[in-house]
Amino acid sequence: MTETQNTSRRPGALIAMSGGVDSSVAAWLMQRDGFDCTGVTMRLTRNEAVNTEGLHTCCSERDIEDAAEVAYAMDIPYEVLDFTADFQEKIIDKFIRVYEAGGTPNPCIDCNRYMKFDHLLRWAEAHGLDHVVTGHYARVEQDEATGRWLLKKGLDENKDQSYVLYNLTQEQLAHVRLPLGGLHKSEVRAIAEQQHFVNARKHDLSLIHISEPTRQ
């Protein structure tokens, strides 16, 4: 991703909005800090798949509505991107293969790697946005001596999510922003309530839960 040469414009940020409180507050923090924000929600499944296959993800139709309402309240552009085909191929089908082979798949890690921090980074670049922002409780810092980007645990030990981001590349880490890494969950909820976000008291969203595949 090429950094802008026009230093007069505000940096752009794609906010990966799941419809939950964390990504909503991440969006608010970035806007407060002077970024031009665009909210984006990934459509991962159709409702029929959720109801019939035991698959539960964030970014359901209700979550999309919540994300859109927060984006409207913040007066930022908002898009829903349809990744259902890739999600089926790269996440669901892989989960089933690994499970049936006796392994222990982790679809959240794969979704972050192949969907959120691949597709969204490329979409951000194509639309002139400098960063992808998520509501993960983790931190990204640059080592001054080596110039390498370091992934660190979030300060809230009870909510740390750095483990699901362990396989991000240096190129990806350079363009990722995690504004919740230095906050505790209670602080995040307090901000959401102060801003009167519709999802301020919403339960935490697990990105993906796939129930045991039915064997014939």
What positions do the PLM features span?
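A short, charged helix-loop
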Residues: E171-L173
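Conserved A3 ("GATE") glycine/threonine-rich loop of ANL adenylate-forming enzymes
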Residues: K159-D160, K202-L207
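Catalytic core of tubulin tyrosine ligase-like
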Residues: R189, V198-H203
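Rossmann-like dinucleotide/flavin-binding elements
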Residues: A192
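ATP-dependent adenylation/nucleotidyltransferase module used to activate substrates
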Residues: M1-N167, R177, K185-V188
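Conserved small/polar residues in nucleotide/adenosyl-binding loops
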Residues: I208-T214
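Active-site and glycan-interaction determinants of carbohydrate-active enzymes
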Residues: Q195
